[in-house]
Amino acid sequence: MAEGDEDSYTDSLMSNENGRPGETNLQEELQMFRARWMSELTPGLSSGGLENRPCNAAARGPVGKVSETKAKQELAKEAKARELFLKAAEEEQNGALYEAIKFYRQAMQLVPDIEFKINYTWSPDGDTKNFLDDANNDSKMADLLSYFQQQLTFQQSKLCQPDIDVTQTHISVLPMEVLMYIFRWVVSSDLDLRALEQLSLVCKGFYICARDPEIWRLACLKVWGRNCVKIVPYTTWRQMFLERPRVRFDGVYISKTTYIRQGEQSLDGFYRAWHQVEYYRYLRFFPDGHVMMLTTPEDPQTIVPRLRTKNARTDAMLLGHYRLSQDTDNQTKVFAVITNKKEEKPSDYQKYRYFRRPQVQETERSFHVGLQLCSSGRHKFNKLVWIHHSCHITYKSTGETAVTAFDIDKMYTPMFFVRVKSFTAVSERPL
């Protein structure tokens, strides 16, 4: 260091003698900087170059240390979130839902997708391990709805998120009220709850919307009216709609009757024809209390498309109202009163213009039908058994009513339900 200072001093003297004062100062500063730099590097060079590698590592050390520190912090955060999540699962199993929600929230705040990173074979203690063993044995959750609701609460996200990037506005930006109104349109006035169940398969948010109690309550009121004011003995309105006996609206009840009758005897007397007669009965119910009934030899492929609306153009069509009745023996019955479609008769003034018009007694004819609602096989409420059928003729002039009751024999075959997809393909009004 002393030799360097002497050299710098000698150079400065020479520069003062031969050069300008400004250049002399610059040279002095450069020499002093070089001297200090060499003095700092001298200890490293004295060890034979072996310490050059640690110096290079120290030069790039801060970046590596920062990345290593971040990795350790992430691992520690994930371990903490894992412990909180498993503790929340244990609290939920014990019935402490509020404590479980608190731990779930803390775990989600640390690592949002901690649920998918947990190895359920690992547990911090023995109690949690026992709980996870029980959970693995029972893979299906008892209450999927509450589980989805908790997940959406922890994540504090929207009901749904787009699966792929789209430029158009996604349905997830709609508020809850608008989404619920759309769901009511899906159910529609035809009570297409099957479409609602299919819609719930889209995502967790749609599943929660499809289980909204208000939708199922409105559906129950549409079916049973004032008879379903109380939800007891069912736990939810959805359970009532699915398990309580009711008629179905998304199809037709059909029965087929076949019998043999004699024909006319041939001229020679040696042969008598026999005819096999087939005819169908169709019964279509509507949520507003209307019912249609048709008896015809035409097959279902021809008749069923005409039964989509109540304005079917068929002469033999009977229209009326129905109601459900549940007796003390828990047998659900359907009673209906149906009449012929009212059509305007052409004026017969010209026909009897020059003659005395005959006195025709005006009458009203209606049919009273009683059916018992049953289930067959794996399908619910898909069978109607005849219990009553009568014809009521009322004479308008006297007000008297003549009742003719028909015997319920083997000609009254049970009616079975057939679902028709086209009946619920279009929604006309919301629920």
UniProtKB/Swiss-Prot annotation:
Pathway: Protein modification; protein ubiquitination. It is found in: Cytoplasm. Residues 168-219 form the F-box domain. GO terms for cellular component: cytoplasm; SCF ubiquitin ligase complex. InterPro entries: F-box-like_dom_sf (IPR036047), F-box_dom (IPR001810), Hrt3/FBXO9_C (IPR045464), MIT_dom_sf (IPR036181). Residues 10-24 have a biased composition (Polar residues). Keywords: Cytoplasm, TPR repeat, Ubl conjugation pathway. Gene3D superfamilies: 1.20.1280.50. GO terms for biological process: protein ubiquitination; regulation of TOR signaling; SCF-dependent proteasomal ubiquitin-dependent protein catabolic process. Residues 1-24 are annotated as: Disordered. Its main location: cytoplasm. TPR repeats lie at residues 81-114. The keyword Cytoplasm applies. Part of the SCF (SKP1-CUL1-F-box) E3 ubiquitin-protein ligase complex SCF(fbxo9). Substrate recognition component of a SCF (SKP1-CUL1-F-box protein) E3 ubiquitin-protein ligase complex which mediates the ubiquitination and subsequent proteasomal degradation of target proteins and acts as a regulator of mTOR signaling. This is F-box only protein 9. It comes from Xenopus tropicalis. The gene is fbxo9.
